[in-house]
A protein has these predicted regions:
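Bacterial N-terminal signal peptides that target proteins for export
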Residues: 2-16
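Residue-level micro-sites within transmembrane alpha helices that shape
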Residues: 11-12, 26, 238, 267
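Boundary at the C-terminal end of the N-terminal hydrophobic targeting segment
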Residues: 28-30
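Bacterial N-terminal signal peptides
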Residues: 15-26
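Non-catalytic cap/lid and distal C-terminal segments of serine-dependent acyl enzymes
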Residues: 36-64, 68-367
Length: 367
């Protein structure tokens, strides 16, 4: 028997928790980190009594060098305003990386550990918490028969969900991340709340599994990926999808099922598109690390084009995987496999790009 435990987090409660944490931080006065000033600059603080040098490295610009006061607290501010957005950052204390211990918002990932700086926009961006109906985040523990181990997955259900059967998007993370990263850092739930509220996307369930079916154990990606993708795909089809369809009001038809992923998750997506297209009608690959293309017969190619209503591939021209995406797209085009290929100018391999890709991709689903 497949046992499950679940925890459910209404998104409005998560927003309230953030406000409580901000209130507690305010009471600590000078201990707040990060602290956003009215002019848009951000101040960081760190206690490191015996350190000789402390700096902050983040996605928001140049490194910030901190100075120590008489109490042993290091502090420093960005020299220019930080634009609204969601950023990763870390302290470098005498050359060693550290999270911001005063900031409760930590990016879920296997390595390296980073803290999250979220500056809301005016008006709100899709990834900001807004005063609109919110869905619910569920966290499930389950036993995988394929992998013979206990696993975890995250499920987003849209606001106002009833017993009506809904389509499902299976959404995979990248190599250094885990099943919680798409919500806690990618803000997938807030993005879908916004798109559904604006009627840009249809109500759907999003399932975010652990895309590491095999522990990477420090292996380089190219050596690790083929076996991991085979194991993940089998677990997805034999454990995860049946689990979801037995616990949620889901339309089980492949026409109501999509898969997307970023980087390593994009590797999974393209593998599924070419090898298991009968199970999905929509596939999205965001900044993918493309897999090897299997030997495909004319009949295989006909089936792929028939099964997939959309094969959406996107990559930035500043991404280190751009050349591989170019080569992959050229090869499937040569094979007459239909796809929608998007090149994003000046985009690199980072979460701001992938949030935008989720915003672009989900409105195309289940129409």
């Amino acid at each position: 028997m497949n046992h499950s435990t679940a925890m459910t987090f209404p998104i409005k409660h998560l927003a309230l928790l953030s406000l409580v944490l901000l209130g507690l931080s305010a009471e600590l006065g000078a201990q707040v980190s990060p602290e956003l000033a009215d002019d848009g600059r951000v101040t960081f603080r760190c206690r490191a009594d015996h350190a000789d040098r402390v700096a902050v490295h983040g996605q928001f610009g140049a490194a910030v060098e901190l100075e120590k006061d008489s109490s042993g607290t290091w502090s420093g501010s960005t020299t220019t305003p930080v634009k609204p957005g969601v950023y990763e950052y870390r302290f470098k204390i005498d050359g060693r990386d550290s999270i911001d211990s005063r900031n409760p918002h930590i990016k879920p990932q296997r390595w390296p550990n980073t803290s999250i700086l979220h500056i809301a926009s005016t008006p709100p961006a899709p990834w900001d918490i807004q005063d609109i109906p919110h869905g619910t985040i569920h966290r499930h523990s389950y036993h995988s028969k394929v992998l013979e181990q206990d696993r975890e997955l995250i499920v987003y259900t849209p606001p106002g969900m009833t017993d009506e059967k809904l389509p499902v998007l299976y959404l995979a993370h990248g190599y250094s991340d885990n099943q919680r990263t798409w919500t806690e850092h990618g803000k997938a739930h807030s993005i879908l709340d916004s798109l559904i509220h604006e009627k840009k996307a249809v109500p759907m369930i999003i399932v975010m599994p652990d895309a590491h079916a095999i522990d990477p154990g420090g292996k380089k990606f190219n050596a690790y990926a083929p076996k991991n993708t085979e194991a993940f795909s089998r677990e997805l089809l034999e454990d995860v999808i049946p689990f979801v369809e037995s616990h949620y009001p889901v339309n089980p038809a492949s026409t109501h099922r999509a898969f997307a992923g970023l980087s390593m998750g994009g590797h999974h997506a393209l593998f599924l598109a070419l090898s298991h297209s009968e199970n999905f009608s929509y596939v999205g690959a965001f900044s993918a690390a493309p897999p090897a293309i299997p030997d495909l017969s004319p009949q295989d190619i006909t089936a792929i084009n028939k099964n997939l209503r959309l094969l959406w591939i996107a990559c930035g021209d500043k991404d280190f995987l751009f050349a591989r995406n170019q080569a992959f797209h050229a090869k499937i085009k040569e094979l007459n496999i239909e796809s929608d290929y998007q090149i994003t100018p000046a985009a690199d391999h980072s979460w701001p790009v992938w949030r935008d890709y989720l915003i672009d991709f989900t409105p195309k689903l289940f129409r």
